[in-house]
Amino acid sequence: MPLAAYCYLRVVGKGSYGEVTLVKHRRDGKQYVIKKLNLRNASSRERRAAEQEAQLLSQLKHPNIVTYKESWEGGDGLLYIVMGFCEGGDLYRKLKEQKGQLLPENQVVEWFVQIAMALQYLHEKHILHRDLKTQNVFLTRTNIIKVGDLGIARVLENHCDMASTLIGTPYYMSPELFSNKPYNYKSDVWALGCCVYEMATLKHAFNAKDMNSLVYRIIEGKLPPMPRDYSPELAELIRTMLSKRPEERPSVRSILRQPYIKRQISFFLEATKIKTSKNNIKNGDSQSKPFATVVSGEAESNHEVIHPQPLSSEGSQTYIMGEGKCLSQEKPRASGLLKSPASLKAHTCKQDLSNTTELATISSVNIDILPAKGRDSVSDGFVQENQPRYLDASNELGGICSISQVEEEMLQDNTKSSAQPENLIPMWSSDIVTGEKNEPVKPLQPLIKEQKPKDQSLALSPKLECSGTILAHSNLRLLGSSDSPASASRVAGITGVCHHAQDQVAGECIIEKQGRIHPDLQPHNSGSEPSLSRQRRQKRREQTEHRGEKRQVRRDLFAFQESPPRFLPSHPIVGKVDVTSTQKEAENQRRVVTGSVSSSRSSEMSSSKDRPLSARERRRLKQSQEEMSSSGPSVRKASLSVAGPGKPQEEDQPLPARRLSSDCSVTQERKQIHCLSEDELSSSTSSTDKSDGDYGEGKGQTNEINALVQLMTQTLKLDSKESCEDVPVANPVSEFKLHRKYRDTLILHGKVAEEAEEIHFKELPSAIMPGSEKIRRLVEVLRTDVIRGLGVQLLEQVYDLLEEEDEFDREVRLREHMGEKYTTYSVKARQLKFFEENMNF
């Protein structure tokens, strides 16, 4: 029995035919209400009404209509209807709780719009509610309106059909009901006006001591005083909805197109946007924040772990230098002492993240040449020591292209920086320590382990980060003891430039040729550059062939981090660089970096499982289909491939650089679009869903808010100038499906190209054709004739002229615009306008 699946909680009220019980589903744990309708002693009319309510609810799906779960007829003669539970109670009780204190106008209009959207949905389904009142309007925990109690609703076959049954609540009944006149959807508009008036004044719109006086007040059309605490637009809208004549009342669709209503909807969406942002901040959902905010926070966290070392006894200094093309923050400056952690953090945080014209760093470091027998081992260790941290940081900041060109030159030139440990800035690679005293790298190992779980800071030295902006330290740093001429003889300038062009897409990173820097700063061994470029291209082609080494290389990297540290070699004589050994070292380094790239793919694959969609994966798939086998890798892989080889991108190879910048810009742009769509609330739905959490009732409430925001956004986009309110049909006849463009009001406003194709109607026997079909066919033929004769633009102007109040002026202007066609099409245009305003198909 279905009732056994629910756990009884309490009775929450009594409806028209039975009681309403709050229950809890045993499986999903959600709360529902079961409406038990006693049909044992009910009349045939009441039985039909109860069955109709269950049938209607099962077909209706709208954010502002009570949700339907299931229904069944028990053996005890009761009809059970399971519906969603509205924790806020009904609107009537909510207004009573105000105790005479008026609601804010935005709250009144918010509820008003939600009730109107529910009525519009019902009317599009050809359903009259016929008992709309504040007791049948419910509120959820998040103040979302739910219209319910469709027990006496009636489904009309056509909009021109009228219902003449005298049912409803007297306070909300329209004058035509008491006069026993036919009525249609305008009766629900009257009831809607009564509800809005009650929300605004906390009183019934029409009230009297007895029923006779109440009926007399409604029939005579004596309007109650309009509320003065609200704007005149709202008062005028209430007055039109409570017009005595049904034809003078606006339809629900026209109500939602009023400029005042659309303005209030925009205010509601803006307030929801702000509330969503606060919820995102409160819940700490970093994915719902804008991408720039996340990156900014990451950049700050990278500087929190900076611990300055004491100065050496030699009095070495750190210089901050800049090129002429840099901005104001890149101007040359020098500091005799290292800054404190607070000053360092303040300095780095002042970097302009929106700067798009910064250049990369130009760094000069001391170079130590390893002995021939120890080059391979130290080079491998140097790469493996730095690579895992770089990989983790790449996984943390997917849109950042990090280009470590000093690292490249040191590896390819078989060199290694040797600065005093006291001069070492920890944001650089922790493996670059002095070689003069042969101190191990062990003192800096805890910093590596501390950075990984905390902020995954990028530790390659010196690094360039491009994510639409230059995120890392773009100030130019030069490390080394400059107080003696001997130290200057050991300095070889290792250079790299990263131009972030203003006219390029945000985040575009282009690697320029090394020779563009001042020629005095070129390294001594630049003669091996062509071979290194070929090696780099060969390495990039080999990256796609080592997927099988992912896990093994990853374990080797972690195992190496725990191995004993190696001592740095002593200073050799500068200039004795063996090109053959350098190439051999490049081969060894290529194997290590290739394995590291494979491990980065594994880490990327594991991290991509945490997100529903990955822009990098989509971009990678698209590139694999469009590009040749030599196409550039995605953002993170491109960063690693640049960090591995020791030569910047050649100028005769612009295509891989462009692919790299395209990867960077597209990935960042998609992330920003995703977050902005969350902030703009037309796509704010996923942001709200994340902020509220995917747990039980919170997720259900979030989905309801998302659906409401989507619906209000669609309502806000309705054209207020459209006077043709064609309601779509649930199941239109096939012959009209082919020609819906003639009923679409977009064609009347020039938004759809006019097509003058002829309509061929399928002949139906008149015996089986209902009256509504005949009228529909006539209107279609009339519309086709008018559009052909006048055209879309002229017909739109004629519609505007027909709105003129002065009849004489209207006819004169119609003659001027229509010219010769006035005699033939003036009457047809009036007829078409009348049918489109008063009949819905």
UniProtKB/Swiss-Prot annotation:
<feature type="compositionally biased region" description="Low complexity">
    <location>
        <begin position="591"/>
        <end position="606"/>
    </location>
</feature>
<dbReference type="InterPro" id="IPR008271">
    <property type="entry name" value="Ser/Thr_kinase_AS"/>
</dbReference>
<dbReference type="InterPro" id="IPR017441">
    <property type="entry name" value="Protein_kinase_ATP_BS"/>
</dbReference>
<dbReference type="GO" id="GO:0035253">
    <property type="term" value="C:ciliary rootlet"/>
</dbReference>
<keyword id="KW-0597">Phosphoprotein</keyword>
<dbReference type="GO" id="GO:0005737">
    <property type="term" value="C:cytoplasm"/>
</dbReference>
<dbReference type="GO" id="GO:2000772">
    <property type="term" value="P:regulation of cellular senescence"/>
</dbReference>
<feature type="domain" description="Protein kinase">
    <location>
        <begin position="6"/>
        <end position="261"/>
    </location>
</feature>
<feature type="modified residue" description="Phosphothreonine; by autocatalysis">
    <location>
        <position position="165"/>
    </location>
</feature>
<feature type="active site" description="Proton acceptor">
    <location>
        <position position="131"/>
    </location>
</feature>
<feature type="region of interest" description="Disordered">
    <location>
        <begin position="517"/>
        <end position="700"/>
    </location>
</feature>
<feature type="modified residue" description="Phosphoserine">
    <location>
        <position position="461"/>
    </location>
</feature>
<dbReference type="InterPro" id="IPR051131">
    <property type="entry name" value="NEK_Ser/Thr_kinase_NIMA"/>
</dbReference>
<comment type="subunit">
    <text>Interacts with RPGRIP1 and RPGRIP1L.</text>
</comment>
<dbReference type="GO" id="GO:0045893">
    <property type="term" value="P:positive regulation of DNA-templated transcription"/>
</dbReference>
<dbReference type="GO" id="GO:0004674">
    <property type="term" value="F:protein serine/threonine kinase activity"/>
</dbReference>
<dbReference type="GO" id="GO:0030145">
    <property type="term" value="F:manganese ion binding"/>
</dbReference>
<protein>
    <recommendedName>
        <fullName>Serine/threonine-protein kinase Nek4</fullName>
        <ecNumber>2.7.11.1</ecNumber>
    </recommendedName>
</protein>
<keyword id="KW-0966">Cell projection</keyword>
<keyword id="KW-0963">Cytoplasm</keyword>
<dbReference type="InterPro" id="IPR011009">
    <property type="entry name" value="Kinase-like_dom_sf"/>
</dbReference>
<keyword id="KW-0067">ATP-binding</keyword>
<feature type="compositionally biased region" description="Basic and acidic residues">
    <location>
        <begin position="607"/>
        <end position="616"/>
    </location>
</feature>
<keyword id="KW-0547">Nucleotide-binding</keyword>
<feature type="modified residue" description="Phosphoserine">
    <location>
        <position position="340"/>
    </location>
</feature>
<feature type="compositionally biased region" description="Basic and acidic residues">
    <location>
        <begin position="541"/>
        <end position="557"/>
    </location>
</feature>
<feature type="compositionally biased region" description="Polar residues">
    <location>
        <begin position="523"/>
        <end position="533"/>
    </location>
</feature>
<keyword id="KW-0131">Cell cycle</keyword>
<feature type="modified residue" description="Phosphoserine">
    <location>
        <position position="723"/>
    </location>
</feature>
<keyword id="KW-0498">Mitosis</keyword>
<comment type="similarity">
    <text>Belongs to the protein kinase superfamily. NEK Ser/Thr protein kinase family. NIMA subfamily.</text>
</comment>
<dbReference type="InterPro" id="IPR000719">
    <property type="entry name" value="Prot_kinase_dom"/>
</dbReference>
<keyword id="KW-0723">Serine/threonine-protein kinase</keyword>
<dbReference type="GO" id="GO:0106310">
    <property type="term" value="F:protein serine kinase activity"/>
</dbReference>
<feature type="modified residue" description="N6-methyllysine">
    <location>
        <position position="622"/>
    </location>
</feature>
<dbReference type="GO" id="GO:0097014">
    <property type="term" value="C:ciliary plasm"/>
</dbReference>
<comment type="function">
    <text>Protein kinase that seems to act exclusively upon threonine residues. Required for normal entry into proliferative arrest after a limited number of cell divisions, also called replicative senescence. Required for normal cell cycle arrest in response to double-stranded DNA damage.</text>
</comment>
<feature type="binding site">
    <location>
        <begin position="12"/>
        <end position="20"/>
    </location>
    <ligand>
        <name>ATP</name>
    </ligand>
</feature>
<dbReference type="GO" id="GO:0036064">
    <property type="term" value="C:ciliary basal body"/>
</dbReference>
<dbReference type="GO" id="GO:0005524">
    <property type="term" value="F:ATP binding"/>
</dbReference>
<dbReference type="GO" id="GO:0006468">
    <property type="term" value="P:protein phosphorylation"/>
</dbReference>
<keyword id="KW-0460">Magnesium</keyword>
